[in-house]
């Protein structure tokens, strides 16, 4: 049993996750395994696999409603090896903050060993750039809790038949912006610049980055860098 402590507990600061030097240096252990029901060739499943492989086994993942909720939580089964929790569509940030605060409280009371445990909250652009933006913004104003928020940018509400989102680029054809006879370009709003907006508006946020899974090692190293910074 761990002993209670009145000291401030920083969950992630003590760990140092070195960057991977290449594909051949990646660990063999998998924490997001086969058996999920994503579509063939789905990149979101690859993102989940690489994200949690980079983070390691001492990780809690929280995911908002979307494809990665529907496809990975078949009744009585899951592809997640690490603890995973579903959150409502707009609450990934607040759920991640609550998980980090709960871990910190349990460690302070001596009910958990004081060690770095990664808390990663995952959402799509609908749950991040639109409905979940306020929760993410509120989470980033609490620098004493360490939460990594990862937004997968589909540039649409992809789980519900490609509707328009705040991350949809100008001129895109979606089910909410089909081309018409009078106006061929129906979507005339510009895509939100989420990275710049979060970085500029939250000076206590310690890390903001953008990645592309075509460069998977670089993406995994960005996850490790964020978790090391805390």
Give, region by region, the residue ranges found by the protein language model.
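Thiamine diphosphate
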Residues: 1-117
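Glycine-rich ThDP/TPP pyrophosphate-binding loop and its adjacent helix/strand module
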Residues: 116-119, 130-148, 152-230
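Active-site metal-binding loops of divalent metal-dependent hydrolases
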Residues: 124-127
């Amino acid at each position: 049993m761990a002993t209670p402590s009145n000291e401030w507990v920083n969950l992630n600061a003590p760990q140092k996750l070195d960057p991977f030097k290449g594909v051949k240096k990646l660990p063999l252990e998998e924490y997001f395994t086969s058996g999920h029901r994503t579509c063939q060739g789905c990149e979101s499943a690859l993102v989940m696999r690489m994200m949690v492989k980079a983070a390691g086994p001492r990780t809690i993942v929280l995911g908002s409603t979307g494809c990665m909720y529907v496809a990975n939580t078949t009744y009585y089964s899951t592809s997640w090896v690490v603890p995973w929790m579903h959150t409502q569509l707009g609450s990934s940030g607040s759920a991640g903050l609550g998980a980090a605060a709960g871990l910190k409280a349990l460690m302070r009371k001596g009910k958990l060993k004081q060690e770095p445990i990664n808390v990663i909250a995952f959402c799509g652009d609908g749950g991040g750039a639109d409905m979940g933006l306020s929760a993410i913004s509120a989470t980033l104003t609490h620098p004493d809790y360490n939460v990594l928020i990862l937004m997968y940018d589909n540039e649409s509400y992809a789980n519900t038949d490609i509707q328009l989102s705040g991350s949809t680029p100008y001129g895109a054809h979606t089910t909410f912006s089909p081309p018409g006879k009078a106006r061929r370009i129906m979507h005339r709003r510009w895509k939100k610049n989420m990275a710049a907006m979060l970085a500029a508006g939250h000076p206590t946020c310690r890390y903001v980055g953008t990645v592309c899974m075509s460069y998977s090692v670089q993406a995994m190293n960005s996850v490790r860098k964020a978790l090391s910074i805390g």
